[in-house]
Amino acid sequence: MNEEIFALERRLMKRTRQDFEQLLADDFYEIGTSGKTYTKGIELDTLLENTVVTELPDILNFRIHELSATVIQALYDTVEFSGRRSHRSSLWRKTNDTWQLFFHQGTSF
């Protein structure tokens, strides 16, 4: 399960519209590193139709905690090419054998 959730996190970092539509739950809520908050609708509105990020940040210290049979918390750090570092926390919910992200928070450090 660790590898599956890791792969889903990486997919979202590429910021494709298709992945956001599929992997973000309708009730998705994010608190960004800036302190701004985002919903699935806001995220989709900010994406260009064919946006793809090619320089993905490094992911360090990735681990998951099973909170229930259908909810997983992923914790990890990211290091971007600029050197910017963030602690990350994601909550994933499994519905009908499909994982969807319903909460994410990033904190710069």
Give names to the regions the model predicted:
Residues 1-22, 27-109:
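A beta-strand edge to alpha-helix "cap/lid" segment located at domain peripheries
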